[in-house]
Regions:
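Intrinsically disordered, low-complexity regions enriched in serine/threonine
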Residues: 2-197
């Protein structure tokens, strides 16, 4: 869509996973590499761009873990997958159906959820996606109600900004994977519970 992207590396120390009462134990970190959309500062993180379980006892171990992440990350593939998103779209009726299924997913039995693609957006984030479908200055739907998957993905990542940092990166990756799951279904004309009855 012509949005300027900047390669970005970042991370946080996962204090939420620390046992503050124990003696010295490995420190935990989450590190990512991906792209920042300069239009809106949304992070675009792919599955191979996240290391969310780094446990280290030294700075050298942390450095080694980050270097491993940087080596395994395929930025060309990541860019290609995001570019592919712009070639597929949902009609307004498909979008409405999808939003309804997202809302239903949250209340399904766990056994039923396991049969669907996992979704980590919560109800308030889904509301944000719907609001921004109409009103986002950069990623709203077209006049006829259609929305391409790049725009939808950015609505997900925008809504994800309300997540606490301890699960922000994982939800960001889930948004990327969910969008690509939908694109695969559209491209291959295969069934998808979120898109079809």
């Amino acid at each position: 869509n012509g949005n300027k992207l900047a390669l970005t590396v970042g991370g946080v120390r996962a204090y939420n996973q620390e046992n503050l009462f124990s003696k010295k134990s490995p420190e935990k970190f989450k590190v990512f590499i991906g792209f920042k959309n300069m239009v809106c500062t949304n992070l675009c993180i792919s599955t191979d761009g996240l290391a969310d379980q780094i446990r280290v006892n030294s700075l050298n171990q942390l450095s080694e873990a980050v270097e491993n992440l940087l080596r395994q990350y395929d930025r060309i593939k990541h860019l290609g997958m995001m570019e592919r998103m712009s070639r597929f779209e949902l009609t307004q009726a498909q979008f409405a159906h999808f939003i309804g299924k997202l809302r239903m997913y949250q209340f399904m039995d766990k056994s039923e959820q396991r049969q669907c693609f996992p979704v980590s957006l919560n109800d308030s984030q889904i509301n944000t996606v719907v609001k921004n479908y109409y009103h986002d200055p950069n990623f709203s739907c077209k006049g006829d109600g259609t929305i391409n998957m790049w725009r939808l993905y950015n609505l997900f990542t925008e809504a994800n900004k309300s997540s606490y940092i301890d699960n922000n990166f994982e939800r960001n990756v889930n948004a990327y994977d969910l969008t690509n799951n939908l694109v695969n279904s559209l491209q291959n004309r295969t069934g998808n519970w979120f898109l079809h009855n």
